[in-house]
Swiss-Prot record:
This is Large ribosomal subunit protein uL29. Transmembrane segments: none annotated. InterPro entries: Ribosomal_protein_uL29 (IPR050063), Ribosomal_uL29 (IPR001854), Ribosomal_uL29_sf (IPR036049). Belongs to the universal ribosomal protein uL29 family. It comes from Nitrosococcus oceani (strain ATCC 19707 / BCRC 17464 / JCM 30415 / NCIMB 11848 / C-107). One of its GO terms (molecular function) is structural constituent of ribosome. GO terms for cellular component: cytosolic large ribosomal subunit. One of its GO terms (biological process) is translation. Keywords: Ribonucleoprotein, Ribosomal protein.
Length: 66
């Protein structure tokens, strides 16, 4: 899990990459949950919140650029 401070030091491209990776991870976890293979449900929550953090920082950067 990355802290918001660490995310703010990254560029927009790096944040987009991170968002893509987290989205893929979320998809895998959702598939595991559907097939009953997911052991720790908290992983899904962690990834979902990380996605929200990245999106928040991306929005902040876009608003600063304007």
């Amino acid at each position: 899990m990355m802290k918001v401070q660490e995310l703010r030091t990254k560029t927009e491209d790096e944040l987009r990459k991170e968002l893509l990776e987290l989205s893929r991870e979320r998809f895998k976890l959702r598939m595991q949950m559907g097939t009953g293979q997911l052991v720790r449900n908290s992983e899904l929550k962690r990834v979902r919140r990380s996605i929200a953090r990245v999106k928040t920082v991306l929005t902040e950067k876009q608003q600063q650029a304007q």
